[in-house]
């Protein structure tokens, strides 16, 4: 029993860390319209039960009543902020942490959110 409980605690912690930045948008259905799709914030249409990645590094799901989106970006917080800086790489949807004096050298990161 303790093993199961411990496993659930670890799983819940992992899920919390992975889903740190999510949001929901209502899926605007027009009464009498039988189309099964979602319209994102840019006006693009997506089939029901589909998944896509936005240019803002969110992963979104088209559900029947809503669009669910979660950030794919982990933000570094455990690093030497006096000597290092974080740089966002849009094309990879990730941060790198480098030395301020020599941006060719990476810094150690001990914690991400």
Curated annotation (Swiss-Prot):
UniProt xrefs under Pfam families: PSP94
Q: Indicate the secretion signal residues.
A: 1-20
Q: Which cysteines are joined by disulfide bonds?
A: 22-70, 38-62, 57-93, 60-69, 84-107
Q: Which UniProt keywords apply?
A: Disulfide bond, Secreted, Signal
| Subcellular location(s) per record | Secreted
Determine if Disulfide bond is one of this entry's keywords.
yes
Q: Which family does it belong to?
A: Belongs to the beta-microseminoprotein family.
What PANTHER family does the record point to? BETA-MICROSEMINOPROTEIN
For this entry, the protein name equals: Beta-microseminoprotein A1
What organism is recorded for this protein? Saguinus oedipus
* Taxonomic path: Eukaryota, Metazoa, Chordata, Craniata, Vertebrata
Q: Which gene encodes it?
A: MSPA
């Amino acid at each position: 029993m303790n093993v199961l409980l411990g496993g659930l605690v670890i799983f819940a912690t992992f899920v919390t860390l992975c889903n740190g930045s999510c949001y929901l948008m209502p899926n605007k259905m027009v009464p009498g319209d039988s189309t099964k799709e979602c319209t994102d914030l840019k006006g693009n249409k997506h089939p029901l039960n589909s998944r896509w990645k936005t240019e803002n590094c969110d992963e979104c799901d088209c559900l029947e009543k809503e669009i669910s989106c979660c950030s794919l970006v982990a933000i570094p917080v455990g690093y030497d902020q006096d000597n290092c800086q974080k740089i966002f790489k849009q094309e990879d949807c990730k941060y790198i942490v480098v030395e301020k004096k020599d941006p060719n050298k990476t810094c150690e990161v001990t914690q991400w959110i």
